[in-house]
């Protein structure tokens, strides 16, 4: 089983915190879609004929695509790859794009999961972040998706936002819970160098949330969502029982995936590769029958580190027998040795051959993971 990620880089405007590759050159959509479909064909052997269990259209803003453009992509996917009948197929969307008419169109396509970038329900903060939607548009978009028959809806939230308090965060969480999405992702705001948000902080126009507040917000996130019946299955992800993101979970469990489009990453079990982060260079290289990318062959230590980073973040934890059989006795013993002080402190535990974070360990997961890495 494997997954496919499709990068749709087009945005009407750029959010001030975003450092993903995106562009506002919507006039190049047609040329891009054509190049993307060519890449899907050029790389049809990358996954060695494995069935496709998940497809994820991310961005950028995939909901900027028209019916014709989406149909072209899905036609290529289904003609070239063996997509399973029960595949999870996700489209990332901005709430203001999700009009009843657009949602009705999406229902005619193989898409069965909507991932909506809401971020917050605070109007002034939405404006500061350069989000295009209002809180009411976000609420209505979820309701319209539900009315149209979508039974798997995910929403993204952010915390640690400028001006945020515990009270406004609780308001956001209560509003999110009231919408009853199947899945909620919640990420702490990161001030990425080079973004407009970074520059605002450097100019003292916004203030970063302090560590104590950030911990309180994260703790409140866990308490509110678990109380509402959501499973905390990965550091930043929550779902109703059985409705975890199958696509993202495939990353965390080390499955192969193909990434197509500018800046997209791929993994085949032994190497990582990533496409050029330029729309023009990407299209030009495809037109010349080539692909502009870089590749990194992964030695056993790098693969071990990736295994640690991805598995420890989940509630499934790390299978010690899998660690031993795949990475050998030396790395198995190394991991146990590095885990010992954390086991003694009660922030890691071993249950039924699985090494995992305890509830206390979740709050210091980055430090624990860092200690387990082979350096």
Regions found by a protein language model. Give the residues of each.
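Minor-groove-contacting beta-hairpin "wing" of winged helix-turn-helix DNA-binding domains
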Residues: 354-358
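A short, conserved structural fragment
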Residues: 343-353
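C-terminal scaffold of the Radical SAM
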Residues: 1, 22-45, 50-329
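Immediate flanking context of iron-sulfur cluster ligation sites
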Residues: 1-8
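Local cysteine-cluster metal-coordination motifs and their immediate loop/turn environment
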Residues: 9-20
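Short amphipathic alpha-helical interaction segments
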Residues: 329-343
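Short, amphipathic alpha-helical interaction segments positioned at domain boundaries
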Residues: 362-375
């Amino acid at each position: 089983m494997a997954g496919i990620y499709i990068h749709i880089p087009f945005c009407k405007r750029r959010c001030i915190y975003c450092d993903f590759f995106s562009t506002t050159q919507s006039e190049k959509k047609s040329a891009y879609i054509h190049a993307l479909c060519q890449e899907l064909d050029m790389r049809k052997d990358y996954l060695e004929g494995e069935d496709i269990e998940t497809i994820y259209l991310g961005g950028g803003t995939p909901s900027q695509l028209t019916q014709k453009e989406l149909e072209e992509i899905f036609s290529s996917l289904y003609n070239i790859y063996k997509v399973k009948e029960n595949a999870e197929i996700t489209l990332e969307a901005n709430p203001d794009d999700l009009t009843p008419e657009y949602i009705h169109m999406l229902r005619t396509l193989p898409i069965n999961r909507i991932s909506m970038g809401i971020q917050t329900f605070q109007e002034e903060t939405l404006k500061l972040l350069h989000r295009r939607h209002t809180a009411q548009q976000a609420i209505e978009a979820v309701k319209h998706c539900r009315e149209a028959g979508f039974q798997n809806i995910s929403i993204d939230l952010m915390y640690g936002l400028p001006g945020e308090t515990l009270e406004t965060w609780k308001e956001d969480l209560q509003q999110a819970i009231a919408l009853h999405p199947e899945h909620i992702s919640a990420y702490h705001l990161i001030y990425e160098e080079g973004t407009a948000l970074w520059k605002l902080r450097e100019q003292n126009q916004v203030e970063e949330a302090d560590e104590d507040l950030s911990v309180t917000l994260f703790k409140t996130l866990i308490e509110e969502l678990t109380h509402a019946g959501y499973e905390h299955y990965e550091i930043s992800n929550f779902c109703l029982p059985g409705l975890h993101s199958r696509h993202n979970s495939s990353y965390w469990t080390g499955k192969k995936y193909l990434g197509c489009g500018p800046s997209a990453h791929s993994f085949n079990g032994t190497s990582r590769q990533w496409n050029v982060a330029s729309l023009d260079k990407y299209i030009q290289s495809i037109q010349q029958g080539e692909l502009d990318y870089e590749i990194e062959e992964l030695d056993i230590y790098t693969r071990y580190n990736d295994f640690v980073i991805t598995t420890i973040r989940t509630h499934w934890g790390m299978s010690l027998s899998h660690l031993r059989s795949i990475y050998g006795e030396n790395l198995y013993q190394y991991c146990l040795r590095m885990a010992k002080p954390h086991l003694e402190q009660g922030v890691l535990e071993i249950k039924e051959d699985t090494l995992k974070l305890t509830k206390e360990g979740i709050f210091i997961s980055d430090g624990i993971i860092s200690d387990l890495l082979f350096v």
